[in-house]
């Protein structure tokens, strides 16, 4: 849930949904097998890192929190998505850059993220180049 009036959840279903569920489920189900312990009692942070990226907190093999929200736009910075951004940035761009909703959607979902901040086109490539000192 978000800290907005509950009526918006009821009427418009605005809440955190998360994404990459199959990937998170697979990883969290493999960990007990790999470490030889049951899922019950395990606390995990599971990461999905690709051109899209997300994190989940899991207890007993079940997700209790996710980095993503209503859409995959919220959360970690991704290949082409902003990740978390101050909502006031939207108002600022509407007022000062005279952008409309479709332009902002395109900017935040396709023309931002790692590929536009660093000129590297994927998160795995970015991580490899960062760790090898090619970019900083």
Where does each model-flagged region fall?
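Glycine-rich phosphate-binding loop of actin/hexokinase-like ATP-binding domains
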Residues: 1-95
